[in-house]
Amino acid sequence: MKNHTSPAAVAAKTFTNATADAYRPADELLRSLDSRTDGLDEEAIAERLDRDGINEVGHEKPAHWSIQLLRAFRNPFIIVLLVLAVVQLFTDPDDLTGPVIIGVMVSISVLLSFTQEYRSSMAAEKLKAMVRNTATVTRRAEDGHAERIEVPVEELVVGDIVHLGAGDMIPADLRLLAAKDLFISQAILTGESLPVEKAAPNGHVQAVDSSGPLDLPTVCYMGTNVVSGTATAVVLATGARTYLGSLARTLSGERVQTSFDRGISSVSWLLIRFMAVMVPVVFLINGIDKHDWLGAFMFGLSVAVGLTPEMLPLIVTANLGKGAIAMSKRKVVVKRLNAIQNFGAMDVLCTDKTGTLTLDKIVLERHVDLAGEDSDEALEWGYLNSRFQTGLRNLMDKAVLTHRDLEAVASRFRIVDEIPFDFQRRRMSVVVTDGRDEQLLICKGAVEEMLQICTEARTGDVVEPLTDEKRREIRAMTRRLNEDGLRVLVVAVRRDPTGDRAYGVADEAGLTAVGCLAFLDPPKDSAATAIRALNHHGVAVKVITGDNEAVTRKICSEVGLDVTASAQGRDIELLDDDALDAMVEKTTVFAKMSPVQKARVVKALQRRGHTVGFLGDGINDAPALRDADVGISVDTATDIAKESADIILLEKNLMVLEEGVLEGRVTFGNIMKYIKMTASSNFGNVFSVLVASAFLPFLPMMPLQILVQNLLYDLSQLSIPFDRMDEEYLRSPQKWDAGDIGRFMVWIGPVSSVFDITTFWLMWHYFGANSPEHQSLFQSGWFIEGLLSQTLIVHMIRTRRIPFLRSVASAPVLALTSAIMIVGMLIPYSGLGARIGMQPLPGIYFAWLALTLACYCVLTQVMKTIYIRRYGRWL
């Protein structure tokens, strides 16, 4: 189960706490935190560390190796086999052959599973190693004087006075006391690629109607980072009490079951229930008919072992391990083995936008005049504005400066003054001169704020008053750019006489608007190809992002993702689960989503029967990564995102996901081969045993013969993980269906019984094995026919095509099945055969055997064709 504190409750509590302190006067806030502007002393720091603990966000740690080893035994088939081995050991302590055979198979399966999981967890733990950071704080020394020092982030406490500069990671949840031109990147929390401005509460920053804690302009959150500017702040919360920590707490506890877990569990219990019903029936029939209850009991135990697909854990683990190795060659770390299979079952991939569909790099897409036509003049004015500002340039300034080299233009000017960007104005200005008798004030900023300070508009050589009608035209033009997913800044200028006066905000008036700059985080070249490939293989792609809707829709259209409908986080918040379930089917883009809302969408898709993959790298993605059937992250992701993921990509490339999907389907297909082969063979064998037990005066096969036959058959299955899958099987998602397995058993299982009974008739009537004195001949004949038919079923079931002619198994499968068939035919002629009660067979038997097996293959192919036509699937 999940942690008892719901994500929604944690987020609400974080919002409430942050809001209470966001606009409180600094002196009042410091008093409430028992702090002061010159910092805390050592006694207060020690007391708070003892009270609150170190400033660290807890994360999952791999279980001790002994616990992982015990977990490897937590499989119903393993438990059943161990119980059968113990019962057989106590029933017949003189014969250890049966328990030893069972013990060997259990040991191999458990050790292989444990080894692979342990290695994967160790590799993942290395990826999750946290980087040690420091923070700059003001603290009081022993003599009472304040000093600015560097301390490990883990040693921060509530009330510490922290100093921030460009490039710093926010070390805890902070309330700003003072700030200058402070821009914070919250991308790891929101997915938004552009930084947001933060400021201390003063005349420029008023309380705003925030929809969540991340919208508070006076609060900075642990895990985000400073893009530009400086600030002084006080620590509000540390460690688990931070917003980041609240997300980490929602990730504690056991994970929800994935489709793989649910599928294996349902298949396991289906086969166990079948065994629990059939074994007592076999025991009673033989006990009543032959009056040897001990012999009947031992025979029943052997049948139980034969019905138990003890190789399932081994086959599953080997398949997943092989898939993990194949993925590692593609620069993918598989943290949890069952995620490989879930790749194949995945029919919906939810992905973020930034860095996945896009380059995660702001570029200047267009520079236009006020009519929306391309304009180099707008670019030149924008270039001068970005070039001559003295503060740390933001991403859009860098995009302007790298768009085109206009240094030759800039070299004609020198800086006179500047008016820095601030939160309220949402614009910045520079004043430059070319050395002649005038100065130029060049301003760029947000559309509405710029239109308020402009009185004229220039398009080409035409200058006209900026009337209300003209403002509406400019707004309509910029809105069209917004709808194309572009972020728009307006550029304006004013010519002033040369002078030595200082410029201020009041000078930003009477400007002439000259054009617009439009920015875009461009799509990756590989994104469109990858989306087409995923769609071709039956995987629908949905975008879940913290970015705005217009930008996301534009990017989706450019990468060929058809947006049938879109929704925003505020829309999701108003829906109950039933309404959300209906919405997620037809919605392609989910924008402005919070972490809790992302997880809700994933769960809604799962309730609709989808197997969901989620690709994300931010802290805001962690709950959804954990709840998805397969969580995918990248090695540059936040620690919480990497912990929550099942798979970590060393390159954030959607093409790797297509390869993972195909690898997962191969893995799933090979697992299903074993399950359906075993289930149908076991069903047919039990039916044959029931018929033989009812009519024969002796056991149709000795218990030890059953165990040897079962071991040989199991060995023939070891090559299945190395088999190939037909191309048509890989085209669509493959999911677990326990009902289909039961149906498959009933349809295909009796086919082998038909030829088992034919063999009984031949051995009884043609070869005279019709009395207890000749039972070894009868048992030898059925042993070989049963083993060869079970081994041939590998080739019959592995493909929906005609085996050997239109679909040939891989070399390992051909080699191992052929070897087992040869060994099986030689056993009656060996010392082992004599020891387990078998005898050589006459040569004519093998002619009949060849005819029987040929007819068996033909009838199985006929039943396969009928089954596929009726139910539309095979594996």
Question: Which residues does each PLM region occupy?
Answer:
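Alpha-helical transmembrane segments of multi-pass membrane proteins
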Residues: 71-91, 106-110, 132-133, 269-287, ...
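Soluble-to-membrane junctions at the N-terminal ends of transmembrane alpha-helices
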Residues: 54-86, 121, 209-219, 250-277, ...
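Transmembrane helix-loop junctions at the membrane interface of multipass transporters and ion channels
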Residues: 690-698, 765-766, 803, 826-842
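Acidic, divalent-metal-coordinating active-site segment for phosphoryl/phosphodiester hydrolysis
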Residues: 528-530, 536, 548-559, 596-607, ...
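Hydrophobic alpha-helical segments characteristic of transmembrane helices
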Residues: 52-138, 240-242, 248-329, 339, ...
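Cytosolic catalytic regions of ATP/NTP-dependent phosphoryl-transfer enzymes
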Residues: 36, 219-227, 342-512, 519, ...
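Non-lumenal N-terminal regulatory segments of integral membrane proteins
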Residues: 1-157, 162-170, 175-256, 262-269, ...
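Membrane-embedded transport module
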Residues: 282, 286, 320-322, 559, ...
